[in-house]
Amino acid sequence: MGIKKYNPTTNGRRNMTTNDFAEITTDRPEKSLLAPLSKKAGRNNQGKITVRHQGGGHKRQYRIIDFKRNKDGIPGRVATIEYDPNRSANIALINYVDGEKRYILAPKTLEVGMEVMSGPESDIKIGNALPLINIPVGTVVHNIELKPGRGGQLVRSAGTSAQVLGKEGKYVLVRLTSGEVRLVLSACRASIGQVGNEQHELIKIGKAGRSRWLGKRPTVRGSVMNPVDHPHGGGEGRSPIGRKSPMSPWGKPTLGFKTRKKNKASDKFIVRRRKK
């Protein structure tokens, strides 16, 4: 992908950049792989806000993605590379020889016409999916399962990748994008290659309205709220927060306060913590 810049014809355009969508081959998604997606606006089933700063935005349809990659031994060919409004990565439509169609995350350098396969006997080739035990040490992977058969949960965002570092018994050592080194069951599957659309992080939104198109609402500082709304609120003019440390809206310490639970079950699988 490339980054498209604009002439400063307005203040909104001055610092705005967009994806040039050079890799996208169609703007019409596969209808059989679409599902309705209703707006939640950050509310739970009681109508209470559980996730702040969400709401509005353009209407979307969900693309059903094959994260499990469990169609073993059946070759498929890449039909299209498509934009997905629900994630930062692009997706690829795969036409299998038995007639089935599935979407997968599009890895870097995957192109229309290339063949992909799943299963233990697959080649170490971009877009193929194999159990970690069958992937050589040093290989770059993405879409990693945490439990066999559950589907990929790790390394799915645009431009991310992990690396297989070694094999220890029934586990495989994997270094994640964050720098964390983690043990993953060797029966778990991963896809070969780095997730595409790697320049996504370089895009500048440019104006508030574009954030609203994406369904992002404004983030308001606690110090400009009333005391009823935030621990930092109240006072005359620009007042200090009056606390020993900054607080979240719910009165919990924040900005550096560790929130990970002690004795978490997955701690035993983390060999080295992520970089701070």
Swiss-Prot record:
Classification via SMART domains: Ribosomal_L2, Ribosomal_L2_C
| UniProt family annotation | Belongs to the universal ribosomal protein uL2 family.
* PANTHER family reported for this sequence: LARGE RIBOSOMAL SUBUNIT PROTEIN UL2M, RIBOSOMAL PROTEIN L2
Descriptive protein name: Large ribosomal subunit protein uL2
Does the record carry Cell wall biogenesis/degradation as a key word? no
Q: How does it assemble?
A: Part of the 50S ribosomal subunit. Forms a bridge to the 30S subunit in the 70S ribosome.
Q: Transmembrane ranges?
A: none
Tell me which HAMAP family the record gives: Ribosomal_uL2_B
Q: Which GO terms describe its cellular component?
A: large ribosomal subunit
Q: Which gene encodes it?
A: rplB
The entry's keywords = Ribonucleoprotein, Ribosomal protein, RNA-binding, rRNA-binding
Provide one Gene Ontology biological process annotation: cytoplasmic translation
Region Disordered: which residues? Answer: 1-20, 219-276
Q: Which Pfam families match?
A: Ribosomal_L2, Ribosomal_L2_C
**Start-end of Polar residues biased regions:** 7-20
Q: Which GO molecular function terms does the record list? A: rRNA binding; structural constituent of ribosome; transferase activity
> What Gene3D superfamilies does the annotation carry?
2.30.30.30, Nucleic acid-binding proteins (2.40.50.140), Ribosomal protein L2, domain 3 (4.10.950.10)
Question: Which function does this protein serve?
Answer: One of the primary rRNA binding proteins. Required for association of the 30S and 50S subunits to form the 70S ribosome, for tRNA binding and peptide bond formation. It has been suggested to have peptidyltransferase activity; this is somewhat controversial. Makes several contacts with the 16S rRNA in the 70S ribosome.
